[in-house]
A protein has these predicted regions:
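Transmembrane-helix boundary motif in ABC transporter permease subunits
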Residues: 66-98, 111, 262-268
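Periplasmic/extracellular loop-to-transmembrane helix junction in inner-membrane transport proteins
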Residues: 1-10, 26-68, 233-241
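C-terminal transmembrane helix and the adjacent membrane-cytosol boundary/short C-terminal tail
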Residues: 147, 151, 155, 189, ...
Length: 275
């Protein structure tokens, strides 16, 4: 028994050491190359300067453009399947399909997005095509996460509310949602992290351009590189690893912040619910 515990501790320590080494290596390589000019300007080949402001804005546009569609669709589908649908066989088939779609490599979504959104629908290579591709890619995850959160609410609470004369939607809004809102919000925040870190699908659909767009004038019709795509371009195509590590450090910091926010939000609602 003692030897088993020692082995598990060694595995845990090794895993933690590898993660810490990776984080430290990226930060040490990347942070010295980050400056205000680097964050607030766009690249210029005339002055040989590098800036990632277009990539930051394009990342923000992609995240917002994806969330606008994936959150209402994913949460709405989960509510219907969990609270309204009566044919359990169809519900099971949809859940199985969602689980399968969640495991498909993102580059396949990129290929499908390029053929459907860019070519068939005529979006061309654009942020709009990239956002819609990420909607399809993240919809199963948001739906299943919300479903699992809804299922954590005891059925007795629903039955008690029905017994008091509450309607279906009122029960969902006043009983079910408050009982699982922490899980739903946490799942949505983690979906933001997945959108933020996506690159393969966007290589096919959103393009590599370092352009700044006015979203209120141009919408998402122009091509643009996100931070992850820019990292690939600088590291693989241009061999500029200093810039690549700087972008990697920024992405790593954003990922840590997103996971921290998800944890804090979950704990806040759990504490509020227990009062």
């Amino acid at each position: 028994m003692a030897s088993s515990c020692t082995a598990f501790r060694a595995c845990a320590a090794l895993t933690a050491a590898l993660v810490l080494f990776l984080i430290a290596y990226v930060l040490i390589k990347g942070i010295p190359n980050i400056s205000w000019e680097f964050l607030s300007t766009k690249p210029s080949y005339l002055t040989d300067s590098v800036g990632i402001l277009p990539d930051i804005l394009n990342t923000l546009y992609i995240v917002l453009g994806t969330l606008v569609w994936v959150l209402p669709l994913g949460v709405g589908a989960a509510i219907y399947l969990t609270e309204y649908a009566s044919n359990h066989r169809i519900v099971g088939a949809i859940e199985y399909a969602a689980e399968t779609l969640s495991g498909i490599p993102s580059i396949i979504y990129g290929l499908v997005g390029m053929l459907f959104f860019c070519n068939f629908l005529g979006f061309q290579t654009s942020l709009q095509a990239g956002a819609m591709t990420l909607v399809i890619m993240n919809l199963p995850t948001v739906m299943r996460t919300t479903q699992e959160s809804l299922k954590t609410v005891p059925q007795s609470l629903r039955e008690g509310a029905f017994g008091l004369g509450a309607g279906k939607w009122r029960v969902i809004r006043t009983v079910v949602f408050p009982g699982c809102v922490d899980g739903i919000i946490t799942g949505c925040i983690l979906a933001v992290g997945r959108i933020l870190g996506e690159s393969a699908a966007l290589l096919f659909t959103a393009g590599f351009a370092h352009n700044i767009y006015n979203i209120f004038v141009d919408g998402l019709s122009g091509a643009g590189a996100t931070l992850t795509v820019a990292l690939y371009v600088y590291a693989k195509e241009q061999g500029d690893f200093e810039i690549a590590f700087a972008i990697a450090a920024i992405l790593m910091a954003l990922t840590v912040i997103i996971n921290l926010v998800a944890t804090l939000v979950g704990k806040y609602y759990q504490k509020r619910r227990s009062i």
